[in-house]
Amino acid sequence: MEKVKPKLNPYADIRKVSLQGTDGTSSSAFAIQTDTGKSGKGKWKEVGVVRDDYLLVSNQQVFDMANHITQQSPLNWEVKKEFFNGKSFGLYYTAKDQTKTIDSENGVKLGDTVALGLHFLNSYDGSKALTAGLHLERLICTNGMVTNHGLGSVRILHDKSNAKWENDVEKILGLIDSSDNQVSNMMSAFSEMDRSILDEAMLRQIATNVIPNISDSTFGKIYRNFSKESKGKDNATVWDFYNACTNVLWHNPTQTRADFTNNAYVTDRMIDFANKELI
């Protein structure tokens, strides 16, 4: 399993405490604190301030929930990635028995297989509601492909102690069961990318018009990765460039939430480009 920021324990104890003014008056806000001490020494650190009605679910509860859901699913799920920066948490699974293969110009492209992924997102500072969603993973390089539009997600409104929690579980399982058409649509766009030769004019078009919100520094990393991986190839494709994007954004050794946001941005924009310009 790929871990990001391993020095932070995503499953440390957490608590929600009322805030008070300097004169002792109560505040309507609450502080979220995590125990950063070794072996539960009670060294509490504030990681966020939220409202009284904020549903605080610990990352341990999220892990238990994810484990319950993946056990209920008929697919064989494996934890592939874990992200935690002290405030935001992500747990990413892959089902290697639920795959599709890129359809190249000469038929099915051997060895380029994409698997269904399932992720759970949580935050301690209120920046992200507890959510479960689907993504894809290219198995040959373990690049994750996140999307805001291509695949569904479920906002989880209850914790395991709530009787309505099972409703959320059923919604997530239904999301998995009904994903085939959505995945097929994404694979169709990926196949068009794979059939499309990337020349300098198209690369400029992508940089300027398709993914203009990617910063110059990030685009530079993507271009270096693309140049390295396509060295010696007669005809690099749009698919090669897109995978350079996801490689940089998924495997950043100093990963931030912005990498996941940019991953979804690039994926959605490139799929839209493929559907409108390449077909």
Identify the residue ranges that each predicted region occupies:
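Feature for intrinsically disordered/low-complexity regulatory segments and propeptides
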Residues: 1-67, 249
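Intrinsically disordered, low-complexity coil segments
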Residues: 36-44, 73, 100-112
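Short secondary-structure junctions
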Residues: 16, 69-83
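Intrinsically disordered, low-complexity regions enriched in serine/threonine
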Residues: 1-22, 98-279
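Beta-rich nucleic-acid/ligand-interaction surfaces
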Residues: 77-99
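A broad "ordered helical/assembly scaffold" signature
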Residues: 49-50, 85, 172-176
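A near-ubiquitous, low-amplitude feature marking generic local secondary-structure context
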Residues: 28, 45-49, 76, 155, ...
